[in-house]
Amino acid sequence: MGDWSALGKLLDKVQAYSTAGGKVWLSVLFIFRILLLGTAVESAWGDEQSAFRCNTQQPGCENVCYDKSFPISHVRFWVLQIIFVSVPTLLYLAHVFYVMRKEEKLNKKEEELKVVAQTDGANVDMHLKQIEIKKFKYGIEEHGKVKMRGGLLRTYIISILFKSVFEVAFLLIQWYIYGFSLSAVYTCKRDPCPHQVDCFLSRPTEKTIFIIFMLVVSLVSLALNIIELFYVFFKGVKDRVKGKSDPYHTTTGPLSPSKDCGSPKYAYFNGCSSPTAPLSPMSPPGYKLVTGDRNNSSCRNYNKQASEQNWANYSAEQNRMGQAGSTISNSHAQPFDFPDDHQNSKKLDAGHELQPLAIVDQRPSSRASSRASSRPRPDDLEI
């Protein structure tokens, strides 16, 4: 019999990417089929044709009777069976190698993107995210481990189905050709035999024992395939019931505005207010409102330049409104809410109309505020 080492090395690589049932199936294939076929079975069928004798001297009669009784040798039939049931497993191994090759390409591309981000400062987060999604799709985990999911899982299930089909097909073919037992005497009536002759088989009982043993091994392999198929199927159903979702498809809703970032009636945001808050009454022409970064999620970090510009605009507005003799609306008279200052609002009497309060600024005043601070206004409150 030929050398089985090449096939054995290929099938041995499948062990790392198979389930427990698949590993048991491979062990049965190696020990009870390949090893037994290469040692005991081959020696039992070594004299198969030479020891086949018929009670006639007609030349060629023994050959045609042997061909009629055994269209294919049992040993060669079992070799074909082993090859056919191993092909689906080898195809699954080819898919695993394809995934590993994809992993190498994705890792190389990921390293290149990281180098570009470090040298040029480019934003490659989206590209890295796409690479992670592809790795998850192919079933690639950290440290080069391949997990059975997606297309790889489907290939594994298909390989189990084909192995089961081949097992059943070869069992039926064997039963149809010569059954599962051998007789000591075979009757043959075929040209060029002059009449019906009797032919005798060498060691029929020993060969029958090996046939039954190989039959049991085939049935065990078929049972392992069916058990593994149900195991993979129910495990997939169990994972779906548990609600294991894709980590790269998490549901994220819109961020809700912070509750302690000021009242929604103000038209400024203080760096963190919700952009959907209702606006205050329209500001006078030329009123430039400088806001902080809306994307900042913390209410403690403010843009210093924006705060100074807001105070300058507020002082200029008070100066302009004081010269015109009009009062400032309540929406602009409110002091800006800075959480770091922790300013408490003042309570007014119910009979007095709400008027703008004078604000004591601890910071340096701008030019506009310094000119307007010395001018009295008729709507100032006495404190």
Curated annotation (Swiss-Prot):
Segments on the Extracellular face: 45-76, 178-208
Residue ranges, compositional bias (Low complexity): 363-375
Phosphothreonine: residues carrying this PTM: T276, T327
Region (Interaction with UBQLN4): 265-383
BP GO annotations: adult heart development; ATP transport; blood vessel morphogenesis; bone development; bone remodeling; cell communication; cell communication by electrical coupling; cell-cell signaling
Disulfide bonding pattern of the chain: C54-C193, C188-C199
Gene Ontology CC annotations of this record: apical plasma membrane; cell junction; connexin complex; cytoplasm; early endosome; endoplasmic reticulum; fascia adherens; gap junction
Keywords associated with the record: Acetylation, Cell junction, Cell membrane, Disulfide bond, Endoplasmic reticulum, Gap junction, Isopeptide bond, Membrane, Phosphoprotein, S-nitrosylation, Transmembrane, Transmembrane helix, Ubl conjugation
Assembly and interaction partners: A connexon is composed of a hexamer of connexins. Interacts with SGSM3. Interacts with RIC1/CIP150. Interacts with CNST and CSNK1D. Interacts (via C-terminus) with TJP1. Interacts (via C-terminus) with SRC (via SH3 domain). Interacts (not ubiquitinated) with UBQLN4 (via UBA domain). Interacts with NOV. Interacts with TMEM65. Interacts with ANK3/ANKG and PKP2.
Role according to the record: Gap junction protein that acts as a regulator of bladder capacity. A gap junction consists of a cluster of closely packed pairs of transmembrane channels, the connexons, through which materials of low MW diffuse from one cell to a neighboring cell. May play a critical role in the physiology of hearing by participating in the recycling of potassium to the cochlear endolymph. Negative regulator of bladder functional capacity: acts by enhancing intercellular electrical and chemical transmission, thus sensitizing bladder muscles to cholinergic neural stimuli and causing them to contract.
Name this polypeptide is given: Gap junction alpha-1 protein
Organism the protein comes from: Bos taurus
Gene behind the chain: GJA1
